[in-house]
Amino acid sequence: DNSVTDDLPYLTFNDEYKMPKVGASVLVVHLSNGSAMGIVAGTYWNSSHRPPVSGKGVYRKDLAQAIGEAFLQYSGGSLQIHAPAITLDASRITLATKSGSITAAEIINHIKG
């Protein structure tokens, strides 16, 4: 019916923030006191807005507006972190596998010789 409301608040999950793109389809929950009041619950997948991956045991979180630009993806026991650049800022970083572990400081010391 082409009706338009004033700006609506956006529901967050655990204080995360990712505003939908202008023109994106969103689910709006209208309050019982009138259709002008409501909350934007978020975007949803549909035939024109499909998820980049799907399947049993797949978890993916896109972090940028462009799908595939930056994301976390978990499937089959493997976590993929994809981004144009990644910065780890910590007092200690350890890489660990079944065969052993090494800290970032040890790697840097080895490179410096």
Task: Explain the meaning of each model-derived region.
Residues 1-5, 71-74:
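Short intrinsically disordered, low-complexity coil segments enriched in acidic
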Residues 2-18:
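Beta-strand/loop nucleic-acid-binding surfaces
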Residues 17-25, 30-113:
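Right-handed beta-helix
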